Amino acid sequence: MTELDEVDSLRSDGDSWTVTESVGATALGVAAARAVETAGANPLIRDEFAPILVSSAGPAWARLADPDIGWLDDDPHGQRLHRLGCDYQAVRTHFFDEYFAAAAGAGIEQAVILAAGLDCRAYRLNWPPEAVVFEIDQPKVLEYKAQILESHGVTAAATRHGVAVDLREDWPAALLRAGFDRDRPTAWLAEGLLPYLPGDAQDRLFEMITDLSAPRSRIAVESFTMNLTGNKQRWNRMRDRLGLDINVEALTYREPGRADAAEWLANHGWQVYSVSNREEMARLGRPVPEDLVDEAITTTLLRASLEISR
């Protein structure tokens, strides 16, 4: 096999995927990190459904969700680096869980999760009685999650609507057909999404969200400054040890001149709050070790509110 830094882009216009391939496989990797965190002694988040979704994809995926990271027993540095990755996923999940709790507390009962993947917030969060959650993603990814959870007797904690559509297509029309009410304030989430969109598609996404948002709507976004050093090492280990080819570098768009998410939102009527992932990790007791700083991911976690009429 080639090294990850020698692989060209695997993306093409109109490409699609199942949960175990291409972008879909990244959802399994993130769910595995949530499973590791949930099994820990003092978890920041609890996602009891993540182990079910990951292990159902096969034994190699189940090993990736091993809370002891036993598949890296003879590689202490690799184990620490993978643990750091799981810590980051826990912190980002916690940030967005708190965002939804605050939105619900402010009376916002409509939520849209973009590129929902194996996100289980519709099932595991404490939603208001009238809450409606729309999950947008590729058809096969949504089908996998719904079928696995249903087979285990899991029901959603809110009214859940799966919206099977590619975010590069006319997803607003599909969302409206599914029952979305553009006159109600909405809590939007774009977590782990932006690098998988071309820059112009990211701009269109924000334009469409703004157009669909009633006053008092909110949005939360994870904005990446991709540090590939540590990530490449983690992906290589997953491939070599588990046979899992999660090559995020080849699946993302790294275009110069891409709009900064916080700046775009601020320039279009949103009031923005942002924090670096490293500040948030330190605040929650999961600081990046000094000797791993150069290998750690760098992102900005932001939330914003819309106070003006569209």
UniProtKB/Swiss-Prot annotation:
Cited InterPro entries: Ppm1/Ppm2/Tcmp (IPR007213), SAM-dependent_MTases_sf (IPR029063), SAM_mthyl_Trfase_ML2640-like (IPR011610)
Keyword Amino-acid biosynthesis: no
UniProt xrefs under SUPFAM superfamilies: S-adenosyl-L-methionine-dependent methyltransferases (SSF53335)
One of the record's GO molecular function terms: methyltransferase activity
GO BP of this protein: methylation
One Pfam family recorded for the sequence: LCM
Transferase found in the keyword field: yes
Ranges annotated as spanning the membrane: none
Residues noted as binding S-adenosyl-L-methionine in the record, renumbered to the chain: D137, D166, L167
Enzyme Commission number(s): 2.1.1.-
Gene3D superfamilies from the UniProt entry: Vaccinia Virus protein VP39
Record keywords, A-Z: Methyltransferase, S-adenosyl-L-methionine, Transferase
Alphabetical list of NCBIfam families matching this protein: mthyl_TIGR00027
Function: Exhibits S-adenosyl-L-methionine-dependent methyltransferase activity.
Family in the record: Belongs to the UPF0677 family.
Protein name, per record: Putative S-adenosyl-L-methionine-dependent methyltransferase MMAR_0356
Organism: Mycobacterium marinum (strain ATCC BAA-535 / M)
